[in-house]
């Protein structure tokens, strides 16, 4: 649908309606796919290999960011007109290739948004072809599902799992701003880096790059090292990530102070802020996926995984509410420049401190698929619980 914005169809339907339809379909697709995909990942593990869950969710998040890296680098390039620099590597290629890369037809919304759709279709086909290679947990049926949801004990479990969500939502309120306020800030910075003038929207490409580096680094080195001295539970990782995220916004606030003073700092400073932000993301995001999966009752895994998306949604709503309430009637804003970023620093610090106070009282249980059921791959999983790990 988004690809049609640059096509003749846009003359018959207003682009804003096409955009709204495309976003609605993305929301429906993401809401259906994401909780089920992450649940399917966890369902491959039972009691005998439960120690691998942390790493597998890290690798799952790794694969997500590999796609994010490709899209954030490629889509802005496909949306903008392109002209090869004289004397550059591209200009030295055969004329036919240069002509193709510079073609206005290539650099258009229908290609920029249509190409990911093609890749999504290919991925769907490959996934379907490999459906017999992984464990399936059969649906329990509507009656059983309803009985589980409206069970008093299940209600207590769900409410318990929701405790960290508001805190993690504030993390997402900050993190998502690398797509908005950080891009606006980059417009006022010197974006020459490695001999290239980067688009302000391309700087965020470093985030998935750093994620691809940090996920295995944290999983195979940092976490085992810290475990020698401190028991590193999921909630402790998340708490540490909240403090780290506040530090990233503090650096961005310092950068903005320089900009407000008339300076034009190098974009490398924002890259360093991305290093810190990505470290916080590595601690919080895949850990929340793992936490949500392990704490959810076996018949409600996909539903519980929705709490991950719920936290992201709450974070976006919080930022939108802040941006609404800081508006003055005359069009000015109460928070601008460095003060805007410092507001989020203090909010994040307060959230992190409160999280550290609340979470020691969290009493959870780890629920995994019954190993015999996973091996048989036949009956609805009955599951079992082991003692608290969160």
Where are these predicted regions, by residue range?
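Hydrophobic or amphipathic alpha-helical targeting/insertion segments
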Residues: 1-36, 40-44, 78-83, 108-130
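C-terminal ends and interior cores of transmembrane alpha-helices
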Residues: 1-19, 240-262
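A gly/Pro-rich, aromatic-decorated transmembrane alpha-helix motif that marks the paired
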Residues: 5-8, 66-81, 85-89, 250-253, ...
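Helical-face signature of the major facilitator-like transporter fold
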Residues: 23-28, 168, 172, 208, ...
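Intracellular juxtamembrane helix-capping segments at the cytosolic ends
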Residues: 32-47, 274, 281-296
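Intracellular loop-helix junctions on the cytosolic face of multi-pass helical membrane proteins
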Residues: 45-54, 58, 63, 75-205, ...
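Conserved glycine-rich helix-kink/hinge and helix-boundary motifs of the Major Facilitator Superfamily
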Residues: 54-59, 198-201, 239, 271, ...
